[in-house]
Amino acid sequence: MAAKDVVFGDSARSKMVEGVNILANAVKVTLGPKGRNVVLERSFGGPTVTKDGVSVAKEIELKDKLQNMGAQMVKEVASKTSDNAGDGTTTATVLAQSIVREGMKYVASGMNPMDLKRGIDKAVAAAVEELKKISKPCTTNKEIAQVGSISANSDTSIGDRIAEAMDKVGKEGVITVEDGKSLADELDVVEGMQFDRGYLSPYFINNPEKQVAVLDNPFVLLHDKKVSNIRDLLPVLEQVAKAGRPLLIIAEDIEGEALATLVVNNIRGILKTVAVKAPGFGDRRKAMLEDIAILTGGQVIAEETGLTLEKATLAELGQAKRIEVGKENTTIIDGAGEAASIEARVKQVRAQIEEATSDYDREKLQERVAKLAGGVAVIKVGAATEVEMKEKKARVEDALHATRAAVEEGIVAGGGVALIRARTAIASLTGANADQNAGIKIVLRAMEEPLRQIVTNGGEEASVVVAAVAAGQGNYGYNAATGEYVDMVEAGVVDPTKVTRTALQNAASVAGLLLTTDAAVAELPKEDAPMPGGMPGGMGGMGMDM
């Protein structure tokens, strides 16, 4: 085990605070509509230019071990806020730096760090309650577009695209972000349920122009095992042929004579069928088959439920208005499932989302909810260069998270104004002793900091603007983009309540930990081993004259 360096008290804290300041100073220049760019070196390819706080924070690793510890703790604030609310990373970093900076002054003057932390926690709890009170619901397309635009660094086209996507697929719908092929942003909407499995044979295609198989008013047969013997399928195929309607078969796999017979029947026009593999793997496959069954009003033919292919009837088959099967995707439009059953299934999957432990599982479950609830929208990001594409894509993803947060918990006035207004709830607070009161003062001061930084980045005098905004009421604030004092909500400068709340809570949490740190343990830097001695010189000339 490598030797460790153990540092105590002020020496440990001051080194860690240096790291906090290095990271925060690099991140906070990006805050606000007039935030500056930060250039990030890449190990291959050109550098990345960004105004995204969390992207800057993620790149920072410091050489000094203790400084790096402090920087990593604040990096945690940024990434936690980004994970929970999708935005507010720079605000959280600015708040954390301010709480640490002010707190260190009090700790240095001999105050009890634990009481300071109690005061900080008390003030933050009161501020969060006040933020919830002044929050207003975000329901209209215009408000959603405003939130998206602000989060995407005042890019209105991104906000408009997100609002349009939410309008098409609903607030719960899945919206994904992909690289576009042109310079302009595009929006593609897939209605109904789509899953990533296509036809098993190109001979099923009946629309050569689009290279898809289209089935109008089809039956849907769902089976959780492989089908290779056509005899298993014959009874149900005969019933479907009598009904004179097409059939989509979704099974674990369809191969051998079963697939060959379906293809021959299709070519001869005896029975219009398409076979596709079931989506997903393992337990997720079972769940997705069940989703399709509920959406189409059918049942999964599975031995567990006592159903077999030979005994299947039309009653067990699902139905839909239209199904399109391409090379890689299958889309079921307007399934015949009952609305109440679909709603119950959506509730069940939402409950699983709450309990999911991994981000991957949560994402897959959210996709299932959206497919059941009504559709998927894809925003294709357009840009002239790859560097611009990466930067813009990151902004679109941030804006998307922020708009979801706004729909969830509502919106407050942006530009740091909501935090200034929430200070009113703290002003009258008192702690159990002078040290706790100092903790409350620390938070009061920190809540001005985001507005100060926005104004500073815009090249104006921060103290004057903060005093003017604090003297105002309600949504009155400073619009840094235009340099005017306006009603922030009317001007469209709004933040999701969840973003502001999460930023404040996470910043206070990590800053409190730093202030109450009394020892730090880090690996000692390794000393480079001396270079081995060189080889002795080569033999000289032999002195032989030829």
UniProtKB/Swiss-Prot annotation:
Residues 534-546 have a biased composition (Gly residues). It is found in: Cytoplasm. Residues 526-546 are annotated as: Disordered. ATP binds at residues 30-33, 51, 87-91, 415, 479-481, 495. Its main location: cytoplasm. InterPro entries: Chaperonin_Cpn60_CS (IPR018370), Cpn60/GroEL (IPR001844), Cpn60/GroEL/TCP-1 (IPR002423), GroEL-like_apical_dom_sf (IPR027409), GROEL-like_equatorial_sf (IPR027413), TCP-1-like_intermed_sf (IPR027410). GO terms for molecular function: ATP binding; ATP-dependent protein folding chaperone; isomerase activity; unfolded protein binding. It catalyses: ATP + H2O + a folded polypeptide = ADP + phosphate + an unfolded polypeptide. Forms a cylinder of 14 subunits composed of two heptameric rings stacked back-to-back. Interacts with the co-chaperonin GroES. HAMAP family: CH60. This is Chaperonin GroEL 1.
